[in-house]
């Protein structure tokens, strides 16, 4: 998973360089790194999903949600504008066709020792330049990481926690030294972050401002309509335009994000051409909403793009920091109260899948009962698990199902019995905890999109006797409450790549549970999960990565830490018929950076919208 707003790419590294003999024990210098992954594109002129002859020009316009007041997403305050990654280069960039392989960007090569992975040297390309023409140097790299490690979000600091020191060797070479050689993937992790100019960092890193830190990326900040829209304009003097990974990439002269407060308003904006490329996440829209005049005129294209990545786990998180959720039987009951079959039929037109795995739809998902290899990992750990979780780990996993009628009677009766078994009791039609307190649950949300999904769930909780409420707050309040873990239940999304690793500790690790702003929104503290995530981070082969991920999957499911909602193994996109892409897209992404504008088609669209 590439670094996100989102979300971090799991970086793999029992580094395999296929053209280097395994017997060489001395440090080597190379232009590509793959951790338990292929390095197929070491000698190609451009990526197979790129069109090196793609025309430059046009505008890519997309939607964003909420608002913004800052340009730096790497500090702990403010709400950053969408799209700032276009302003910066990373030391290396990943292939979208391989599990995890990195190719040169700001760095044109690396030096490391396969037998001692406690350090790596990145060689900054002497041709690399910031927007103002000044060279990118090792001092800028060190200053960037020093700022992120000392002032960045806690989950990022945790992710980079194995960095011991950063040494400037000379103007072009920077050496990362790690606390041990156990974490193989950290060598590649440090190649994934944007690099800022030291001069900007020294004065502006923690300022809440709409002026970005100085970068070297393919775009500069264009027009900003505070809180409403932001655009990025292509830098025609971009130093890296001829790099292998960039040929046929960054083809749009402008990339614009238009902000909306709700999906309904955003969809209307798409219909009227306010923005022209849309990721369609609403099933009812996809099934029946594309019948407006522009569709009938042949100017809107709908496309379903497949992906080999795991389907992101979207679920209703139960905050384990709250006493209410400590008993696993309560969490089981809350899971049973969610009626997926009715929702999928009634709200989603049957388009979604129930997520049976935290790595759903990939080779990483645990299926059936544990294999012999999985049992070898699990056997010494089982005694440390509570009985219900232990039993669920050892059996085939299946979430509760209903007949889709909307009554969900069988599951609710089972949920009621689980509550009674846990010591809850009823008095005057109300549900009370064993300590005599009323059983109350507030589900936190922002925006309106999830309301129609959550309200039926709230009704089922009330049928069980809970004093359940849905609390909608504005964006800034939501983000602050999320940062402080101030919620009972909330929808969260855990995106995964095909190469999970050290970032799993940030999602599920005990150390992350009490760090404000970290990614462990559930608050899991489980020593067995800690041991398995550690083993996964130190995996030395692809087989080990798959093995430990499947074991982790079983543990997370068996803990009933969230209510899995729904997902889909493909991405639905709709766009005004001015955009083009290569015939074969990459296996792991939509790869919008490699699309381009058909100028004649764009003219037809513009003419239509003027009518």
Feature map (PLM): residue ranges:
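Gly/Pro-rich hinge or "lid" segments in bacterial periplasmic/extracellular proteins
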Residues: 67, 78, 87-98, 190-249, ...
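Aromatic-rich, solvent-exposed beta-strand/loop patch
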Residues: 106-108, 113-115, 131, 136, ...
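Aromatic- and charge-enriched surface segment that lines or borders ligand/interaction sites
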Residues: 109-153, 169, 175-177, 266-269, ...
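Detector for C-terminal structural segments
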Residues: 26-27, 31, 64, 82, ...
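Surface-exposed binding/hinge segments that line
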Residues: 123, 157-202, 206-207, 216-225, ...
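N-terminal lobe/hinge region of extracytoplasmic solute-binding protein
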Residues: 26-115, 123, 146, 214
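Ligand-site clamp/hinge motif
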Residues: 125, 207, 240-291, 332, ...
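Extracellular/periplasmic solute-recognition and catalytic clefts
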Residues: 165-168, 222-233, 258-322, 329-333, ...
């Amino acid at each position: 998973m590439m670094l996100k707003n989102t979300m971090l790419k799991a970086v793999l590294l029992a580094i395999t360089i296929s053209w280097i003999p395994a017997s060489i024990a001395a440090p080597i210098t190379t232009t590509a790194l793959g951790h338990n992954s292929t390095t197929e594109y070491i000698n190609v002129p451009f990526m197979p999903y790129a069109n090196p002859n793609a025309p430059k020009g046009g505008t890519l316009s997309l939607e964003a949600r909420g608002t913004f007041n800052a340009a730096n997403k790497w500090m702990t305050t403010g709400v950053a504008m969408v799209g700032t990654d276009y302003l910066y280069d990373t030391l290396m960039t990943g292939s979208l066709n391989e599990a995890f392989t990195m190719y040169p960007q700001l760095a044109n090569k690396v030096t490391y020792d396969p037998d001692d992975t406690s350090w790596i040297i990145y060689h900054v390309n002497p041709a690399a330049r910031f927007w103002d023409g000044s060279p990118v140097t090792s001092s800028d790299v060190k200053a960037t990481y020093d700022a992120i490690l000392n002032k960045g979000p806690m989950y990022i600091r945790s992710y980079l926690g194995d960095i011991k020191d950063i040494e400037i060797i000379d103007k072009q070479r920077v050496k990362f030294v790690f606390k041990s050689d156990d974490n193989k993937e950290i060598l590649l992790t440090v190649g994934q972050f944007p690099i800022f100019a030291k001069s900007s960092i020294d004065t502006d890193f923690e300022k809440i401002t709409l002026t970005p830190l100085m970068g070297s990326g393919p775009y500069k900040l264009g027009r900003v309509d505070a809180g409403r829209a932001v655009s990025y304009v292509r830098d025609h003097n971009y130093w890296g335009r001829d790099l292998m990974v960039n040929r046929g990439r960054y083809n749009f002269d402008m990339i614009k994000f238009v902000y909306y407060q709700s999906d309904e308003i955003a969809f209307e904006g798409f219909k009227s051409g306010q923005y022209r490329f849309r990721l369609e996440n609403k099933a009812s829209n996809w099934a029946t909403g594309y019948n407006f005049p522009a569709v009938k005129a042949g100017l809107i294209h709908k496309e379903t793009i497949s992906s080999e990545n795991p389907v992101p786990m979207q679920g209703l998180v139960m905050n384990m920091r709250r006493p209410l959720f400590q008993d696993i039987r309560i969490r089981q009951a809350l899971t049973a109260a969610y009626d997926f079959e009715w929702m999928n039929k009634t709200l989603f037109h049957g388009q979604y899948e129930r997520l049976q795995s935290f790595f759903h739809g990939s080779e990483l998902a645990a299926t059936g009962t544990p294999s012999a290899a999985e049992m070898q990992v699990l056997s010494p750990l089982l005694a440390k698990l509570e009985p219900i979780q232990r039993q669920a780990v050892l059996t085939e996993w299946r979430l509760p199902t209903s007949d889709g009628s909307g009554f969900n009677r069988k599951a609710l009766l089972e949920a009621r019995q689980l509550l009674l078994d846990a010591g809850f009791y009823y008095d005057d039609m109300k549900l009370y905890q064993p300590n005599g307190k009323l059983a109350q649950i507030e589900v936190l949300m922002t925006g309106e999109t999830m309301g129609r999904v959550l309200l039926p769930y709230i009704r089922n909780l009330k049928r069980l006797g809970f004093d359940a409420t849905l609390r909608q707050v504005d964006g800034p309040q939501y983000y602050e409450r999320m940062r402080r873990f101030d919620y009972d239940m909330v929808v969260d999304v855990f995106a995964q790549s095909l190469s999970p690793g050290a970032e799993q500790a940030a999602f599920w690790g005990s150390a992350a549970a009490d760090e404000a702003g970290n990614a462990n929104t559930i608050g899991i503290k489980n020593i067995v999960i800690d041991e398995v995530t550690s083993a996964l981070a130190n995996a030395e082969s692809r087989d080990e990565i798959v093995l430990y991920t499947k074991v982790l999957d079983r543990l997370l499911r068996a803990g009933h830490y969230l209510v899995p909602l729904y997902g889909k193994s493909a991405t639905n996109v709709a766009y005004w018929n001015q955009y083009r892409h290569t015939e074969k897209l990459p296996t792991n992404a939509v790869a919008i950076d490699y699309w381009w504008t058909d100028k004649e088609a764009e003219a037809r669209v513009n003419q239509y919208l003027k009518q």
